[in-house]
Amino acid sequence: MAAANDQDSVMGADLATTLLAEGRRSRLVQRLREDLQIVESIDMDVTVMEQGSVVMLEACCPEDQIEQVEAVIEEELKRARVDAIADDELHRAQQLVGNGLRFSLEAPGSVAAIAGSQSLWGRTQALLSPLTYLQTWTVERLQQSLLPRLQPDQAFTLFALPEDSE
Protein backbone atom coordinates (compact mmCIF):
# COMPACT_ATOMS: atom_id res chain seq x y z
CA MET A 1 0.00 0.00 0.00
CA ALA A 2 0.89 3.66 0.03
CA ALA A 3 4.04 5.07 1.57
CA ALA A 4 3.91 8.41 3.36
CA ASN A 5 5.73 10.22 0.55
CA ASP A 6 3.11 9.14 -2.02
CA GLN A 7 0.16 11.37 -1.11
CA ASP A 8 -1.76 10.33 -4.22
CA SER A 9 -1.72 6.67 -3.18
CA VAL A 10 -2.41 7.58 0.45
CA MET A 11 -5.57 9.39 -0.60
CA GLY A 12 -6.53 6.47 -2.84
CA ALA A 13 -6.10 4.02 0.03
CA ASP A 14 -8.21 6.25 2.24
CA LEU A 15 -10.88 6.38 -0.47
CA ALA A 16 -10.89 2.59 -0.87
CA THR A 17 -11.23 1.90 2.86
CA THR A 18 -13.93 4.57 3.16
CA LEU A 19 -15.85 3.11 0.24
CA LEU A 20 -15.75 -0.29 1.91
CA ALA A 21 -16.31 0.44 5.59
CA GLU A 22 -17.07 4.05 6.53
CA GLY A 23 -20.66 4.89 7.33
CA ARG A 24 -23.93 3.03 7.06
CA ARG A 25 -23.99 3.12 3.27
CA SER A 26 -20.50 1.69 2.81
CA ARG A 27 -20.42 -1.78 1.35
CA LEU A 28 -19.29 -3.80 4.36
CA VAL A 29 -21.31 -1.87 6.94
CA GLN A 30 -24.44 -2.02 4.80
CA ARG A 31 -24.18 -5.73 4.17
CA LEU A 32 -22.88 -7.04 7.51
CA ARG A 33 -24.43 -4.69 10.05
CA GLU A 34 -27.49 -3.25 8.36
CA ASP A 35 -28.73 -6.07 6.09
CA LEU A 36 -27.52 -9.31 7.68
CA GLN A 37 -27.15 -7.93 11.22
CA ILE A 38 -24.31 -10.34 12.01
CA VAL A 39 -21.74 -7.82 13.26
CA GLU A 40 -21.92 -5.32 16.07
CA SER A 41 -19.41 -3.11 14.30
CA ILE A 42 -17.06 -3.15 11.36
CA ASP A 43 -14.25 -0.73 10.68
CA MET A 44 -11.44 -0.45 8.15
CA ASP A 45 -8.56 1.97 8.55
CA VAL A 46 -5.33 2.67 6.75
CA THR A 47 -2.28 3.45 8.86
CA VAL A 48 0.29 5.27 6.76
CA MET A 49 3.95 4.74 7.58
CA GLU A 50 7.14 5.92 5.96
CA GLN A 51 7.77 2.82 3.81
CA GLY A 52 4.19 1.66 3.29
CA SER A 53 0.80 1.28 4.90
CA VAL A 54 -1.15 -1.23 6.89
CA VAL A 55 -4.88 -1.65 6.38
CA MET A 56 -6.76 -3.06 9.34
CA LEU A 57 -10.26 -4.47 9.01
CA GLU A 58 -11.96 -5.12 12.34
CA ALA A 59 -15.30 -6.86 12.69
CA CYS A 60 -16.90 -7.44 16.09
CA CYS A 61 -19.40 -10.25 16.06
CA PRO A 62 -20.69 -13.17 18.12
CA GLU A 63 -18.30 -16.09 18.04
CA ASP A 64 -20.80 -18.34 16.26
CA GLN A 65 -20.97 -15.83 13.37
CA ILE A 66 -17.23 -15.64 12.64
CA GLU A 67 -17.25 -18.00 9.65
CA GLN A 68 -20.22 -16.29 8.03
CA VAL A 69 -18.76 -12.83 8.66
CA GLU A 70 -15.44 -13.87 7.15
CA ALA A 71 -17.20 -15.34 4.09
CA VAL A 72 -19.27 -12.20 3.52
CA ILE A 73 -16.21 -9.95 3.91
CA GLU A 74 -14.34 -12.03 1.34
CA GLU A 75 -17.32 -11.89 -1.02
CA GLU A 76 -17.69 -8.11 -0.66
CA LEU A 77 -13.97 -7.45 -1.15
CA LYS A 78 -13.98 -9.52 -4.34
CA ARG A 79 -17.19 -7.86 -5.52
CA ALA A 80 -15.71 -4.39 -5.01
CA ARG A 81 -12.83 -5.31 -7.27
CA VAL A 82 -14.89 -6.49 -10.22
CA ASP A 83 -18.45 -5.13 -9.97
CA ALA A 84 -19.31 -1.62 -10.94
CA ILE A 85 -18.86 0.97 -8.23
CA ALA A 86 -21.49 3.66 -8.67
CA ASP A 87 -20.39 7.24 -9.18
CA ASP A 88 -22.42 8.29 -6.13
CA GLU A 89 -20.50 5.75 -4.00
CA LEU A 90 -17.20 7.25 -5.11
CA HIS A 91 -18.47 10.80 -4.61
CA ARG A 92 -19.69 9.91 -1.10
CA ALA A 93 -16.26 8.44 -0.24
CA GLN A 94 -14.50 11.52 -1.64
CA GLN A 95 -16.73 13.76 0.49
CA LEU A 96 -16.09 11.73 3.65
CA VAL A 97 -12.32 11.63 3.16
CA GLY A 98 -12.18 15.33 2.31
CA ASN A 99 -14.34 16.32 5.27
CA GLY A 100 -12.32 14.08 7.58
CA LEU A 101 -9.10 15.83 6.55
CA ARG A 102 -10.64 19.28 6.87
CA PHE A 103 -12.13 18.59 10.29
CA SER A 104 -8.94 16.97 11.59
CA LEU A 105 -7.17 20.26 10.93
CA GLU A 106 -9.40 22.00 13.46
CA ALA A 107 -7.43 20.42 16.30
CA PRO A 108 -4.06 22.04 17.03
CA GLY A 109 -2.55 18.65 17.88
CA SER A 110 -3.38 17.31 14.41
CA VAL A 111 -1.88 20.34 12.71
CA ALA A 112 1.25 20.01 14.85
CA ALA A 113 1.55 16.30 14.03
CA ILE A 114 1.27 16.91 10.29
CA ALA A 115 3.66 19.87 10.34
CA GLY A 116 6.14 17.96 12.50
CA SER A 117 6.11 14.94 10.22
CA GLN A 118 6.52 17.10 7.13
CA SER A 119 9.41 18.96 8.70
CA LEU A 120 11.08 15.78 9.90
CA TRP A 121 10.94 14.12 6.48
CA GLY A 122 11.51 17.27 4.43
CA ARG A 123 8.17 17.08 2.65
CA THR A 124 6.51 20.39 3.32
CA GLN A 125 3.23 21.07 1.59
CA ALA A 126 0.07 23.01 2.25
CA LEU A 127 -2.09 21.28 4.84
CA LEU A 128 -4.99 20.86 2.43
CA SER A 129 -2.92 19.85 -0.61
CA PRO A 130 -3.80 16.14 -0.24
CA LEU A 131 -7.35 17.11 -1.23
CA THR A 132 -6.14 17.78 -4.78
CA TYR A 133 -5.48 14.06 -5.20
CA LEU A 134 -9.02 12.99 -4.33
CA GLN A 135 -10.46 13.97 -7.70
CA THR A 136 -7.78 12.03 -9.60
CA TRP A 137 -9.17 8.73 -8.31
CA THR A 138 -11.73 7.14 -10.59
CA VAL A 139 -13.66 3.93 -10.09
CA GLU A 140 -11.49 2.24 -12.71
CA ARG A 141 -8.27 3.39 -11.08
CA LEU A 142 -9.38 2.17 -7.64
CA GLN A 143 -10.39 -1.20 -9.06
CA GLN A 144 -7.16 -1.63 -10.98
CA SER A 145 -4.54 -0.38 -8.56
CA LEU A 146 -5.82 -0.48 -4.96
CA LEU A 147 -8.71 -2.88 -4.51
CA PRO A 148 -6.61 -5.87 -5.68
CA ARG A 149 -4.33 -5.20 -2.71
CA LEU A 150 -7.26 -5.45 -0.30
CA GLN A 151 -8.16 -8.99 -1.29
CA PRO A 152 -8.19 -11.83 1.25
CA ASP A 153 -5.28 -13.63 -0.43
CA GLN A 154 -3.16 -10.53 0.31
CA ALA A 155 -4.09 -10.46 4.00
CA PHE A 156 -3.45 -12.01 7.37
CA THR A 157 -6.31 -12.83 9.71
CA LEU A 158 -6.22 -12.62 13.48
CA PHE A 159 -9.11 -13.79 15.63
CA ALA A 160 -9.39 -12.37 19.14
CA LEU A 161 -11.71 -14.62 21.12
CA PRO A 162 -12.83 -14.47 24.74
CA GLU A 163 -10.63 -16.43 27.13
CA ASP A 164 -13.37 -18.93 27.95
CA SER A 165 -13.87 -19.68 24.26
CA GLU A 166 -13.25 -23.17 22.99
Language-model segments: residues:
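Short, conserved charged micro-motifs
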Residues: 7-9, 64-69, 166
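M16/insulysin-pitrilysin zinc metalloprotease superfamily fold
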Residues: 22-24, 35, 39, 43, ...
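His/Glu-based metal-binding/catalytic segments typifying zinc-dependent metallopeptidases
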Residues: 1-25, 118
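C-terminal regions of mature proteins
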Residues: 93-166
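Short beta-strand-to-loop capping motifs
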Residues: 1-2, 59-61, 161
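Glycine-rich, charged/polar anion/phosphate-binding loops
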Residues: 2, 40-46, 141-144
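Buried hydrophobic packing residues in well-ordered domains
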Residues: 14-16, 32, 57, 73, ...
